Amino acid sequence: MASFQRKLAQGLESRGIEVVYRLEDTPFAAVLVVGGLRDLAGLSRARQRGIPVIQRLNGMNWLHRLRRTGARHYLRAEYGNAILRLIRSRIATKIVYQSDFARDWWEREHGPTRVPAWVIYNGVDLELYNPNGLHSRPEHAWRVLLVEGRLAGGYEVGLETAVGLVQRMQAFRSRPVELVVAGEVAPSLQMYWQNQAHISIRFMGQVAPEQIPEVDRSAHLLYSADIHAACPNSVVEALACGLPVAAFDTGALSELVTQDAGKIVPYGGDPWRLDPPDLESLASASLEILVEQDRFRPAARARAEATLGLDRMVEAYLEVLLPGRV
């Protein structure tokens, strides 16, 4: 969320549009609500003054209902859902969904809105995130990359699946396959998998945004672990760097990863119930990507250039925020 705000603000400011971050910083021409907001009264007053209120929506919190994440996390997740639902139904004058999947999910659960809605994919700076530049991609091993901000609160299941994927890939091939995890992982969880996985696994911890392009270029494949992700930035960034993506067909992955930009395979069960996934099919698809890098890497970059550029995203948001200004 912070990454999106920073990129959008920079894009707007480069077009001569001032950006403020508090409802008290009047005057302003429109309000973009990114995530939850505590000052619902202030938001309502802005709408009453005739100021457009645009809500940007991804998905909803749901993993906490299936996995034990603690009472505090459960209540926080439900509270977050309630705030988003209230803004969507009572306050917003326009809605921007991050993907068709996100729109369909919200409309299935809570019905369509009476206000206009758009779908705008997340974008990335195609000059900063590109296939050319420093990298340390190994020549005699295959590197599978997992990028998540934080693997906790139920999202630990993504690491478990990534380990299972690499185990099966290693069983199919004699060439070494290593798993690199970029993101916050509890030390106890790191130790558990280092002792139990029986594969080469390296935990990088949280990686600074400016280092992500080199990290992406240094891998052969990104495994997108987030189930039912609305529009994961890690996928957008990987594609821009020419890194093919492998994932199960959940969330918006099939919208983002098209043609030879990667491989999206059926989950093999009910992902909404966290059924065990079909790792054999994903491993087979992943190995196809690994042995045909010359086919998949250019296609990944081409997909990003066609649809996922930052300028394209900024212009789309600008048309919603300030119609006619573009």
Tell me what each language-model feature is.
Residues 85-116, 124:
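A short, active-site helix/loop in glycosyltransferases that binds the activated sugar's phosphate group
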Residues 190-213:
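Nucleotide-activated donor-binding/catalytic signature segment of Leloir-type glycosyltransferases, i.e.
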Residues 227:
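Aromatic "clamp/platform" in nucleotide-sugar-dependent glycosyltransferases that forms part
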Residues 135-167, 180:
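Conserved donor-binding/catalytic core segment of Leloir-type glycosyltransferases
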Residues 149-150, 163, 175-190, 205:
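Glycosyltransferase donor-sugar binding loop
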Residues 134, 277, 281, 290-321:
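A charged, aromatic-enriched C-terminal amphipathic alpha-helix characteristic of glycosyltransferases
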Residues 107-108, 123-140, 214:
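Acidic anion/phosphate-binding donor-loop and adjacent secondary structure
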